[in-house]
Amino acid sequence: MEVAPEQPRWMAHPAVLNAQHPDSHHPGLAHNYMEPAQLLPPDEVDVFFNHLDSQGNPYYANPAHARARVSYSPAHARLTGGQMCRPHLLHSPGLPWLDGGKAALSAAAAHHHNPWTVSPFSKTPLHPSAAGGPGGPLSVYPGAGGGSGGGSGSSVASLTPTAAHSGSHLFGFPPTPPKEVSPDPSTTGAASPASSSAGGSAARGEDKDGVKYQVSLTESMKMESGSPLRPGLATMGTQPATHHPIPTYPSYVPAAAHDYSSGLFHPGGFLGGPASSFTPKQRSKARSCSEGRECVNCGATATPLWRRDGTGHYLCNACGLYHKMNGQNRPLIKPKRRLSAARRAGTCCANCQTTTTTLWRRNANGDPVCNACGLYYKLHNVNRPLTMKKEGIQTRNRKMSNKSKKSKKGAECFEELSKCMQEKSSPFSAAALAGHMAPVGHLPPFSHSGHILPTPTPIHPSSSLSFGHPHPSSMVTAMG
């Protein structure tokens, strides 16, 4: 299917282009419950176009750029197949959500033929809405169509609620099931004056539906905020609207920004920070569980690891290991230590006749010799001369090797660093994070975007935009 140049092009809608097609307006479409005086000025529609840029749509700095965008060459207006269909931005004929919806559809079909309205790829939106015009963006509010009124005010009427609720699909709300009502063939003809007379009653009915739907949306958000993944959504339904022109819409305030330092980041998760918050609790729990235990072998009440013997009785770590290795209980009485070689009574050196030495050795004949005489004989194969005998035992101070010096110095530096980190607050500590996150808590309410994260800024600034043809990336995004 090819779209002829004379047919409406992409985004060529009177609500978006400041009502350049006055013949497409009809009194039957005047069922919007917002007054024109409450609408935003056209300059603030820039926020909505910034949101559309994150979804693959072209970004326009002001309505003048939007009007200039439609003047691209007819060669670029040929769209093959349904690949450029934007079902969540363009209206679909199968939306029997409201009583006045069929009249709006019939009036739109009679005055403005748009091939998008019969696209087989269109699908129902997440929230009920009435069409503000053929191919116009769907409004999240029931009956918040932007077809009535002239100028850019009507475009804001339909664009602002859409931008406010565009990210609500992130919350996982199931769509409201549509009523099993097929479009009445009697109302699909040309629009009649009866549609304009029914506009007032439809507006009153849609006001009630809007209030009911908003209450259900607030309750759904409260139920959603009960989950552990979204603790900051509990205040969404209770915050008064301060920035949005519609007083009944709850503005989004990032309440979870104040809890970043305590709930999202653990103080011990960074280098040099204190131990994690759950370690003292686990230690106290382990100590409380181990209280009252006693080793059945040695009677010890404190041990790094409690073990059990074959009968299930508690053993300390030492007794348990001894029993495991030797197969018998660990002896309670320490064996007498063997007398050291230096303190052997009655032993004297066969060479120098000394009785004190650090180590007793034996010569080739098997006679005991002192350490000095034994080493001398081992090195020179001659007995040590008696002139070298000294009364005191000479010990030398061994020089530390470079490896041992480096290892010792590294250990000392690490200890000093850990002490400094514990004394002073780390830059990654909870206090520092709270200080950095403090400006986040004072952000203005997100009244134009329902995303949890702020909308990313466009890659190209608005001043350098070229209005020749849309970027291929937006076309690829449109397929999804």
UniProtKB/Swiss-Prot annotation:
It is found in: Nucleus. The modification Phosphoserine is found at S73, S192. GO terms for cellular component: cytoplasm; nucleoplasm; nucleus; transcription regulator complex. There is a cross-link at K389 (Glycyl lysine isopeptide (Lys-Gly) (interchain with G-Cter in SUMO2)). GO terms for molecular function: C2H2 zinc finger domain binding; chromatin binding; DNA-binding transcription activator activity, RNA polymerase II-specific; DNA-binding transcription factor activity; DNA-binding transcription factor activity, RNA polymerase II-specific; RNA polymerase II cis-regulatory region sequence-specific DNA binding; RNA polymerase II-specific DNA-binding transcription factor binding; sequence-specific double-stranded DNA binding. CDD domains: ZnF_GATA. GO terms for biological process: brown fat cell differentiation; cell differentiation in hindbrain; cell fate commitment; cell fate determination; central nervous system neuron development; cochlea development; commitment of neuronal cell to specific neuron type in forebrain; definitive hemopoiesis. InterPro entries: TF_GATA-2/3, Transcription_factor_GATA, Znf_GATA, Znf_NHR/GATA. Its main location: nucleus. Residues 119-209, 448-480 are annotated as: Disordered. The keyword Cytoplasm does not apply. Endothelial cells. PANTHER family: ENDOTHELIAL TRANSCRIPTION FACTOR GATA-2, TRANSCRIPTION FACTOR GATA FAMILY MEMBER. Interacts with BRD3. Interacts with AR and CCAR1. Interacts with MDFIC. Transcriptional activator which regulates endothelin-1 gene expression in endothelial cells. Binds to the consensus sequence 5'-AGATAG-3'. It is linked to Immunodeficiency 21: An immunodeficiency disease characterized by profoundly decreased or absent monocytes, B-lymphocytes, natural killer lymphocytes, and circulating and tissue dendritic cells, with little or no effect on T-cell numbers. Clinical features of DCML include susceptibility to disseminated non-tuberculous mycobacterial infections, papillomavirus infections, opportunistic fungal infections, and pulmonary alveolar proteinosis. Lymphedema, primary, with myelodysplasia: A chronic disabling condition characterized by swelling of the extremities due to altered lymphatic flow, associated with myelodysplasia. Patients with lymphedema suffer from recurrent local infections, and physical impairment. This is Endothelial transcription factor GATA-2.
